């Protein structure tokens, strides 16, 4: 899961959106650094990551990637799941538009930015004004996201090439998304994540 799915599941679980978005920017035990609700959100994000990476449907998707890209497949898949969530948002969340959800998330997160790490503040300088969460629905934007990640982290250079595997196996990946994401939504609503 990437930013959109983590925020969506957090919202369904009534968990801290700030904590769920912040989690990748916090190392170690966050207790004592943030308030308990934010810590609980960070921990939920970590549980969702472990759960998602170990789902049989997600593990099976690694086979859709060429040998040279398989090492980065879990990262690519996290971004791809956000694409399918954004693309099918109205079907999954008919009562709230994606722009409306994005606005709600932004309003809950931005007031707390001064208390967060500089790298997280930097992310927030792009994610909201450039409408990343909404643009995840656009497949070319996913290619740009992967290329950007590859250029910022040389050891992840294979991310740029992994987009070809996504395009080649798009429908199979979409089918797998539908096999697990609605169930994760229900788990979030039931506070089981």
Swiss-Prot record:
Catalytic reaction(s) noted: holo-[ACP] + H2O = apo-[ACP] + (R)-4'-phosphopantetheine + H(+)
GO molecular function ontology, one term from the record: [acyl-carrier-protein] phosphodiesterase activity
E.C. no: 3.1.4.14
UniProt keyword list: Fatty acid biosynthesis, Fatty acid metabolism, Hydrolase, Lipid biosynthesis, Lipid metabolism
The keyword Lipid biosynthesis appears for this protein: yes
InterPro entries (alphabetical): ACP_PD, ACP_phosphodiesterase_gpbac
Superkingdom of the organism of origin: Bacteria
Signal peptide as annotated in the record: none
Biological processes per GO annotation: fatty acid biosynthetic process
Similarity-based family: Belongs to the AcpH family.
Record function comment: Converts holo-ACP to apo-ACP by hydrolytic cleavage of the phosphopantetheine prosthetic group from ACP.
Protein name: Acyl carrier protein phosphodiesterase
């Amino acid at each position: 899961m990437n930013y959109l799915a983590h925020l969506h599941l957090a919202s369904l679980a009534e968990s801290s959106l700030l904590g769920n978005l912040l989690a990748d920017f916090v190392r170690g035990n966050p207790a004592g650094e943030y308030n308990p609700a934010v810590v609980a959100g960070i921990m939920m994000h970590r549980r969702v990551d472990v759960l998602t990476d170990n789902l049989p449907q997600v593990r099976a998707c690694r086979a859709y990637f060429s040998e040279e890209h398989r090492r980065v497949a879990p990262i690519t898949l996290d971004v791809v799941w956000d694409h399918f969530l954004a693309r099918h948002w109205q079907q999954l969340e008919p009562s709230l538009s994606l722009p409306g959800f994005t606005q709600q998330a932004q309003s809950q997160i931005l007031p707390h930015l001064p208390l967060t790490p500089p790298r997280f503040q930097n992310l927030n300088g792009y994610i909201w004004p450039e409408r990343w969460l909404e643009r995840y629905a656009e497949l070319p934007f996913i290619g740009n996201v992967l290329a950007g990640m590859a250029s910022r982290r040389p050891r992840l250079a294979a991310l740029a090439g992994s987009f070809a595997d996504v395009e080649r196996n798009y429908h199979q990946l979409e089918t797998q998304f539908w096999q697990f994401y609605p169930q994760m939504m229900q788990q979030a609503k039931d506070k089981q994540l």
